[in-house]
Amino acid sequence: MKLLYGTGNPAKLDAMRHRLAGLGIELIGLKDLGGVKQPEIIEDGKTPLENARKKAEAYFNARHMPVCSGDSGLYFDNVAEDDQPGVHVRTVNGKYLSDEEMTAHYAALAEKYGGLTGRYKNAVSLILDADHRYDAMDPSMESAPFRMVSTPHPMSKNGFPLDR
């Protein structure tokens, strides 16, 4: 089965291809569609699931093929609501952050709170056809808790600057 993974992030596409290896699924990304114009999607949901659904529906309606989209939110323990990234992990005060800007922002946040314990809450939305839609977001899909400190590790993965 050919399945469109609704992301423009090559690191996320590679990670999902690895997870699906051996299942008989040909996972393609948005860039694999060539120069076809993609719908503009404003990820303004309040939860990862709302954003995952929004992306899956937009890509399904535009491409008329099976689509899987995901979204994540980053949540820290004992951090003020104003400082919680939630679904806006890469966007701070309306600005989309580069990998380097993300590293600096979260290092400063860790400094402010004396270190952070966080986790990613993840959601997926799968649309096979008009009659078969599946959504999931529950605690079993969350990342393991992790610790973030103000001094970044020198090694990082392109596209995943906080995963060091």
For each predicted feature, which ranges?
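Anionic-ligand binding patches
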Residues: 2-4, 10-164
